[in-house]
């Protein structure tokens, strides 16, 4: 599938809400090479190697003597991040931080599945953590909501198209969808069976987040629908979504591969805007300038992993949270 856009030598840090990131259970690498980038694909098709978050640091705790776990809440839930010896600056920041505090986090998206549990945890391996203010947090909420609504619109469009798999990727790209999203949507359809019922529930979460920033509500309702809920979603009607500037579906004429098109599935035309894929703004200062390939995951996380599995973790501030485990990986972790 298409290569991801990069900024210099680094992949773009995309923005997703914690509620959707918490639902992510698909990760993959496009090659077997040791340092090949790893991607987490969310239920709306966001394909994340790196992600950028701004929210409230609600808790910092020791997983063991060498690993810290932090929780950063947005209006929809909480992101979990683990810092150890291979992340000295984020670890030092978390050690000295006093919760609650507004912070930004840039890092690698990861998933982890314990051997003895039928559950997948998502987390962010930190590249940088910085102090920000409420205005930065609010701007992040707006940008994450706008990116989420665009992805939902593209996904809805994709569900109405007669293609699946690589054929759908090519068809979406031919219509003008960003290559990264065009590669993620078919994988999300195949892995999650994401329905329009879920899309509309997530759409409502994004709208409520915008209303929260505008001062029209006090909190965002929890996302209590799973990606595959609602059957095939054929009867679900989505509320208002952004207009997509895409080529007409009838203008797309691609050669269908062996994996051919599924006729009965509804795919909608979602669009991946550059806005969604933009690198973090300067005032967020959330990344180190010369990050290239993924570093090996700290071995000390092996011990942290068993602890993280068994932790019930309560989130002090926001809602649902993705309870990620530190992963021992040969490459970057989630």
Please describe what each predicted stretch is.
Residues 221-334:
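Long, low-complexity intrinsically disordered regions
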Residues 60-65, 114, 134:
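Short, conserved beta-turn/loop elements at beta-strand boundaries and strand-helix junctions
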Residues 95-102, 115-218, 322:
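Extended, charge-rich, solvent-exposed interface segments
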Residues 41-51:
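Short, glycine/small-residue-enriched coil/turn segments at secondary-structure junctions
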Residues 88-93:
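Short alpha-helix capping/helix-loop boundary micro-motifs
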Residues 49-59, 98-111, 124-129:
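OB-fold and OB-like beta-barrel modules that bind single-stranded nucleic acids
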Residues 1-40, 205-213, 223-232, 238-240:
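OB/S1-fold single-stranded nucleic-acid-binding modules
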Residues 46, 62-87:
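OB-fold (S1/OB) nucleic-acid-binding surfaces
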């Amino acid at each position: 599938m298409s290569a991801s856009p990069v900024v210099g030598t680094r992949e773009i840090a995309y923005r997703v809400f914690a509620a959707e990131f918490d639902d992510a259970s698909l990760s993959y690498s496009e090659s077997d090479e040791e340092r090949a980038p790893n991607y987490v694909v969310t239920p709306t098709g966001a394909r994340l190697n790196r992600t950028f978050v701004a929210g409230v640091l609600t808790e910092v705790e020791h997983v063991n003597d060498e690993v810290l776990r932090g929780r950063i809440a947005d209006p929809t839930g909480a992101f979990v991040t683990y810092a150890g010896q291979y992340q000295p600056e984020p670890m030092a920041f978390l050690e000295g931080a006093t919760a609650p505090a507004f912070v930004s986090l840039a890092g690698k998206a990861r998933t982890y599945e314990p051997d003895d549990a039928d559950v997948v945890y998502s987390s962010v391996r930190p590249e940088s953590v910085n102090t920000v203010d409420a205005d930065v947090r609010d701007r992040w909420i707006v940008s994450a909501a706008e990116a989420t609504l665009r992805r939902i619109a593209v996904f809805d469009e994709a569900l109405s198209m007669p293609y699946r798999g690589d054929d759908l990727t090519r068809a979406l790209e031919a219509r003008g969808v960003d290559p990264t999203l065009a590669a993620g949507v078919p994988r999300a359809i195949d892995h999650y069976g994401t329905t329009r019922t879920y899309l509309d529930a997530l759409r409502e979460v994004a709208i409520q987040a915008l209303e929260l920033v505008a001062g029209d509500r006090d909190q965002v309702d929890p996302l209590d629908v799973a990606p595959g809920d609602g059957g095939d979603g054929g009867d679900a009607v989505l509320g208002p979504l952004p207009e997509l500037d895409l080529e007409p579906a009838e203008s797309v004429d691609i050669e269908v591969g062996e994996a051919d098109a599924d006729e009965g599935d509804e795919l909608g035309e979602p669009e991946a805007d550059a806005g969604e894929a933009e690198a973090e703004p300067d005032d967020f200062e959330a990344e180190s300038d010369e990050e290239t390939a993924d570093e090996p995951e700290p071995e000390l996380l092996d011990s942290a992993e068993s602890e993280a599995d068994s932790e019930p973790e309560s989130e002090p501030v926001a809602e649902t949270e993705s309870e990620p485990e530190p992963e021992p990986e040969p490459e970057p972790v989630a």
